UniProtKB/Swiss-Prot annotation:
Origin organism lineage: Eukaryota, Metazoa, Chordata, Craniata, Vertebrata
InterPro entries noted in UniProt: C2_dom, C2_domain_sf, EF-hand-dom_pair, PH-like_dom_sf, PH_domain, PI-PLC_fam, PLC-delta3_EF-hand, PLC-like_Pdiesterase_TIM-brl
Entry binding sites for substrate: K476, K478, S553, R580
Assigned GO CC terms: cleavage furrow; cytoplasm
Region (Substrate binding): 69-97
Ranges that cross the membrane: none
Keyword Mitochondrion: no
Modified residues (Phosphoserine): S101, S492, S569
Role of this protein: Hydrolyzes the phosphatidylinositol 4,5-bisphosphate (PIP2) to generate 2 second messenger molecules diacylglycerol (DAG) and inositol 1,4,5-trisphosphate (IP3). DAG mediates the activation of protein kinase C (PKC), while IP3 releases Ca(2+) from intracellular stores. Essential for trophoblast and placental development. May participate in cytokinesis by hydrolyzing PIP2 at the cleavage furrow. Regulates neurite outgrowth through the inhibition of RhoA/Rho kinase signaling.
Stretches with biased composition (Acidic residues): 494-509
UniProt key word Cytoplasm: yes
Name of the gene: Plcd3
Gene3D superfamilies (UniProt xref): C2 domain, EF-hand, Phosphatidylinositol (PI) phosphodiesterase, Pleckstrin-homology domain (PH domain)/Phosphotyrosine-binding domain (PTB)
The name this protein goes by in its record: 1-phosphatidylinositol 4,5-bisphosphate phosphodiesterase delta-3
Length: 785
């Protein structure tokens, strides 16, 4: 429980006098709603707080624009697009009426806005429109790009500039400001007659919108407590008072009282005591004073180095108060070690936007992968018409894209999110002539980015480091002299994969159509400098020095077999050489495997289908969330030491205890926005992903009919043997008695980057988009034996 005793005040008389002036708690920063024009148009309150109500571009977006939506050479449809007054969403007209939620998209879900013919769709289908009139809105997750053409270049620019301003303001918002923004957008929607007054019926509608099923009698009592005019309508300050009551955080108030005592403000020394109890390493009085200056809202309190409840809540909702160590969100690891010492974010079938049977191939898939920090992408290369190689999933109905278009996308987008090296994993099915074309395109398009020879002064027995290869692109491919099969043929890349899969999947042997044998062109072979592709059939050490520049490829099944039968040998192999693991060919729907199993053995290039959401991609996102999301994460020391004895199947006795007290959640999303009476019954599951003996999951009870501020106060405890490898996945589900629970949100974090104490967990959707302001509030304790 959160209950705790009072603390005696240790302040001077002057501090006590000031504390009495500033102690009154607020739920928000003071609202200007009752004293300005936003009272007349309450929906504009959000834009006013963003400082954008007078912006000409935003004003034009509020009025709306008729833009052409472009899908093909013949499909050009005019649609009305209009920014909503909440500043968070854009409404658009549809030819076929659908549910209201299907007529909007949210600014926070936008990945990028590109001008001109920068998207694949506009390059192919936008020739009839001037580039200056065109723009592309690219979304996070699986939502398709929106390719648009405006009547004039100026109107296109207004949307490009306006969306950029809105995204920048949204990114700069604190969690508390997002909450304020969020609740007022629902308030505007609940005000059915738009008279800036709220009847009890409208208040009940608001409560259902924000996922609260409140007893009518209790809701009416709250309503009447705020109805100071006694006219059965709330307006202005009365509405703000109601929202303050609604958004109270009793559990935070209890923690605050423990440290602040009777006068309800924290001095710098009391805040320092809280930080020390939190386990903040190196916390000092100066740190506490700086936090007060950063997060306190009351200027009088700030001047006297005091923190009110509002400032305390602002701090706990900030990145500094979150569960993820904010120091780990930038590049903090040693980037000067050999490539084999890092986990490297890797994609399989990167070109696909859907399944590998009939999905679409697109350069946009590469752009999205790079935006997510991916550093190793796959190019499945086949003979194309007109002497130009194409990329697609061979012998299927997937569409085809030109090899050169993909290389241009690599050139333009490989280093937008990370400066560290990119590996192009070539699956080569082309003849000698088109292989030579591939080599020419790689050299001419990538230029100096492409690594074409070994680095000067580099130890030939060791791979270079990410730091040495900043801004460079490596080719993973076959190197002459090529490996030969038992009958002496030179194998194609796909045959190698098939040979391994046939060993494990003999039932498919008759159905497999084997690629014809092909040689490797000298031009393409010369580009495989540090990533020479080879089959990894055995872990027996070969005579002579280690072949550090070879990359062993193997299926998920073969990797599991190595881990089970020769765990330590596999780990040692991966201390010096790169290993790429790919999904079995049986996964026709582009499903993923559990990457944690491969990371446990030190495999660096664990390739997943980035286009397929699920817990596997959640783990991948969590693994690479740290170190600036640069796509490289340093492996634990026992996965880097040449003579390591670590075996993921036998990791030794437990040496760490993790205790997570799940306290509350805030503002969970509705699962069915079109059904007001649909309220979630949330439960929280905490999953541990690590070596097999560490894997576990435990969950709380469910809370009936409350997605707004459910409370659990339940502790879940885990004993861990290899904590450095552990990922902790927090999952919120809607409990269902008759069918599987429905997913609400999740967050996956590396244990090594978790901070102890009272922390907020910021939840993500199934596609990885932010669900702000939805959070979990937990207490974390990590004890090492």
């Amino acid at each position: 429980m959160l209950c705790g005793g009072w603390k005696r005040s240790r302040r001077s008389p002057e501090e006590s006098r000031v504390s009495a002036q500033v102690a009154a708690p607020l739920a928000f920063p003071p609202s200007p709603a009752s004293s300005d024009s936003s009272t007349k148009r309450p929906g504009l309150r959000a834009l006013k707080k963003m400082g954008l109500t007078e912006d000409e571009d935003v004003q034009a977006m509020l009025r709306g624009s008729r833009l052409l939506k472009i899908r093909s050479r013949t499909w050009h449809k005019e649609r009305l697009y209009r920014l909503q007054e909440d500043g968070l969403s854009v409404w658009f007209q549809r030819r076929i009426p659908r549910a209201a939620s299907k007529h909007i998209f949210f600014v926070q879900h936008i990945e990028a806005v590109r001008e001109g013919h920068q998207s694949e769709g506009l390059r192919r289908f936008g020739g009839a429109f001037a580039p200056a009139c065109c723009l592309t809105i690219a979304f996070k997750g699986r939502r398709k790009n929106l390719d648009l053409a405006a009547p004039t270049a100026e109107e296109a620019q207004r949307w490009v500039r306006g969306l950029a301003k809105l995204r920048a303001r949204l990114d700069a918002m604190s969690q508390r400001e997002r909450l304020d923004h969020w609740i007022h957008s629902y308030l505007h929607r609940a005000d059915s007659d738009q008279d800036s007054k709220m009847s009890f019926k409208e208040i009940k509608s608001l409560l259902r919108m924000v996922n609260v099923d409140m007893n009518d009698m209790y809701a009416y009592r709250l309503f009447k407590e705020c109805d100071h005019s006694n006219n059965e309508r709330l307006e202005g300050a009365e509405i703000e008072a109601f929202l303050r009551r609604l958004l109270k955080r009793p559990e935070l108030e209890e923690i605050f009282r423990r440290y602040s005592g009777e006068d309800r403000v924290l001095s710098a020394s009391e805040l320092l005591e809280f930080l020390e109890d939190q386990g903040e390493d190196g916390a000092t009085l100066a740190c506490a004073q700086q936090l007060i200056q950063t997060y306190e809202l009351n200027e009088t309190a700030k001047q006297h180095e005091l923190m009110t409840l509002d400032g305390f809540m602002m701090y706990l909702l900030s990145p500094e108060g979150a569960a993820l160590n904010v120091a780990h969100t930038c590049v903090f690891q040693d980037m000067g070690q050999p490539l084999a010492h890092y986990f490297i974010s890797s994609s399989h079938n990167t070109y696909l936007t859907d399944s590998q049977i009939g999905g679409t191939s697109s350069t946009e898939a590469y752009i999205r992968a790079f935006a997510q920090g991916c550093r190793c992408v796959e190019l499945d290369c086949w003979e194309g018409p007109g002497g130009e190689p194409v990329i697609y999933h061979g012998h299927t109905l997937t569409s085809k894209i030109l090899f050169r278009d993909v290389i241009q996308a690599v050139r333009d987008h490989a280093f937008t999110s990370s400066p560290y090296p990119v590996i192009l994993s070539l699956e080569n099915h082309c003849g000698l002539e088109q292989q030579a074309v591939m080599a020419r395109h790689l050299r001419s398009i990538l230029g100096d980015m492409l690594v074409t020879q070994a680095l000067d002064s580099q130890n030939p027995e060791e791979l270079p480091s990410p730091e040495q290869l900043k801004g460079r692109i490596l080719v993973k491919g076959k190197k002459l002299p090529a490996a030969r099969s038992e009958d002496g043929r030179i194998l194609s890349d796909r045959e190698e994969e098939e040979e391994e899969e046939e060993e494990a999947e003999e039932a498919l042997e008759a159905a497999e159509q084997r690629s014809r044998a092909k040689q490797i062109s000298p031009e393409l072979s010369a580009l495989a400098v540090y990533c020479c592709a080879t089959r990894l059939r055995t872990l027996d050490p070969s005579p002579g020095p280690p072949q550090s520049c070879t990359v062993g490829s193997l299926s998920e099944r073969k990797a599991r077999k190595f881990t089970r039968e020769a765990g330590t040998s596999f780990v040692r192999h991966n201390t010096q050489q790169l290993t790429r693991v790919y999904p079995l060919g049986l996964r026709m729907n582009s499903a993923n495997y559990n990457p944690q199993e491969m990371w446990n053995s030190g495999c660096q290039l664990v390739a997943l289908n980035f286009q397929t959401p699920g817990y596997e991609m959640d783990l991948n996102t969590g693994r690479f969330l740290i170190n600036g999301q640069c796509g490289y994460v340093l492996k634990p020391a026992y996965l880097r030491q040449l003579n390591t004895t670590f075996d993921p199947e036998c990791p030794g006795p437990p040496r760490t205890t993790l205790a997570i007290q799940v306290l509350t959640a805030q503002q969970l999303p509705k699962l069915n926005a079109e059904k007001p009476s649909s309220i979630v019954d949330p439960l929280v599951r905490v999953e541990i992903h690590g070596v097999p003996e560490d894997c576990a999951q435990k969950e709380t009870d469910y809370v009936l009919n409350n997605g707004f501020n459910p409370c659990w106060e339940q502790t879940l405890q885990f004993r861990l043997r290899a904590p450095e490898l552990v990922l902790v996945r927090f999952v919120v589900e809607d409990y269902d008695t008759t069918s599987p629970n429905d997913f609400v949100g999740q967050s996956t974090l590396p244990l090594s980057s978790l901070k102890q104490g009272y922390r907020h967990i910021h939840l993500l959707s199934k596609d990885g988009a932010s669900l702000a302001p939805a959070t979990l509030f937990v207490h974390i304790r990590i004890q090492n034996s």
